[in-house]
Regions:
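Glycine-rich oxoanion-binding loops at beta->alpha junctions
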Residues: 107-135
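Glycine-rich, aromatic-lined ligand/substrate-binding cores of catalytic
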Residues: 237-312
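Short internal beta-strands
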Residues: 85-93, 174
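Conserved anion/nucleotide-ligand pocket segment
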Residues: 194-264
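Bacterial Sec-dependent N-terminal signal peptides
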Residues: 1-34
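Glycine/threonine-rich flexible loop motifs
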Residues: 145-157
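Conserved functional hotspot residues or short segments at active or partner-binding sites
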Residues: 281-383
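Glycine-rich, charge-decorated loop segments at or immediately adjacent to ligand/cofactor-binding or catalytic sites
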Residues: 98-103, 172-194
Length: 399
């Protein structure tokens, strides 16, 4: 039985893309005169509206689920305007409006604007149940991802796929560009280190769109009991993975711009330490520091910011560190920031908290840092796994 469909992509092209190994290319920033207007799946209603006609629809969406071609109209509003019978909305971490802090509870509610029930998939309940899907004929997933394993929207997608598969509900995935899709990097997650911030044996920077990753999850049998989800992907039009993509809406409260998104895979490891990565400032994931002058010359003081960062690490303490806001947007993953902070800390094992290994997807990274290995030595140890992943990834590449 076929469980992965690609809307309107010719069959011969699908097979070609599935088995070609595409080399990683440098990120390209076209000049205004040669700028190509891509179309996300949401901006292709001529493709998906016929698939939703006459059906009761459940949506997995948040503030990023917009139609750029309709002045950033939200997908919920657009579908209802077009007469699609939307019956409920499922939401990930950060909630429907994207204003809940990292780790903050997201509650079920009724949306005041539309009257639709909002069902949280973050917290105690992460998978849509049979009861939640009983009045739904088809589910649509449209969340802007950033291409990093510990960004939890792909974990939500995994559970949505699982819930749909277990309850025989088709899933329509609206694809969007991956702003970190031009390369892969970092350790591949090892068995026994899976969690909601890492559910799949993929590298930290995985280089896939959500549509491609859904195909991999399905094809590799990573859902519970190896169930298969009936997936249809609406691909992005006129986008390639070496094409720079600036997100029109910030994907979560603490990724406010392109620089933060490119630095995110490198700096998020500080979440597994007591070093601040700028939560509680207006430039999160663009700086790092600690209340000790030996960490660097740049100074900042994290404070509680409602809707962005409540009670951030090192709150109300002056931190010293590095300002990375002028890093080029071609920036790629590096361990150097983490190693530099570790070196000046003098804390050895106490530098890390229990969350670090979950972010890394292994305990080997922590052990290598403690052993004094360089960034180059550590990265070299990942190459065998990354080569195997490149071969796996090539089977599911759509762009």
């Amino acid at each position: 039985m076929k469980h992965f469909n690609l809307v309107f992509l010719p069959v011969f092209l699908l097979h070609t893309l599935a088995f070609c190994k595409t080399p990683e290319k440098s990120l390209q920033h076209p000049s205004p005169s040669e700028k190509i207007e891509i179309k996300t799946a949401a901006d292709q209603p001529e493709v998906y509206l016929p698939l939703l006609s006459g059906k009761k629809v459940g949506l997995v969406v948040n503030q990023t689920s917009i139609l750029s071609s309709k002045n950033n109209m939200h997908l919920v509003d657009y579908l209802m305007m077009e007469g699609v019978e939307v019956v409920k909305v499922f939401v990930p971490e950060h909630g429907f409006r994207g204003d809940a802090d990292a780790g903050e509870a997201v509650n079920n509610e009724i949306d005041k604007r539309t009257g639709l029930p909002i069902v949280s998939l973050y917290g105690n309940n992460k998978k849509p149940s049979a009861a939640m899907l009983a009045d739904v004929d088809i589910v649509v997933y449209d969340l802007q991802d950033v291409g990093v394993r510990f960004y939890t929207y792909i974990s939500t997608m995994h559970y949505v796929m699982e819930g749909c598969a277990e309850n025989q509900k088709p899933l329509l995935i609206f694809d969007r560009p991956n702003p970190n899709g031009d390369y892969i990097a970092g350790p591949v997650l090892k068995k026994g280190f899976d969690s909601f911030v890492g559910m799949h044996p993929i590298p930290v920077v995985h280089g896939l769109t959500v549509g491609e990753l859904a195909g991999m999850i399905n094809g590799e049998g990573w859902l519970k009991n190896k169930v298969k989800c009936d997936i249809t992907v609406v691909p992005v039009k006129d986008w390639t993975r070496d094409m720079a993509y600036s997100l029109p809406i910030k994907p979560s409260p603490n990724l406010p711009n392109d620089t933060a998104i490119r630095l995110y895979p490198s700096l998020c490891f500080f979440e597994g330490t007591d070093v601040s990565l700028g939560r509680g400032t207006h430039f999160p994931f663009q700086v790092y520091g600690y209340p000790d002058p030996k960490y660097g010359d740049f100074r900042f003081t994290p404070v509680s910011i409602p809707g962005m960062s409540k009670n951030p690490p090192q709150q109300n303490k002056e931190c010293y560190g590095k300002d990375l806001r002028n890093e080029p947007l071609t920036h790629r993953f590096t361990l150097q920031y983490l190693l530099d902070a570790y070196a000046v800390s003098g804390k050895k094992e106490k530098f890390f908290n229990n969350f670090f290994d979950k972010l890394a997807g292994t305990d080997q990274l922590r052990k290598d840092i403690i052993a004094g290995k360089s960034a180059a030595e550590i990265a070299a140890s990942w190459e065998t796994d990354l080569d195997a992943y490149r071969d796996l990834k090539a089977k599911y590449t759509l762009y």
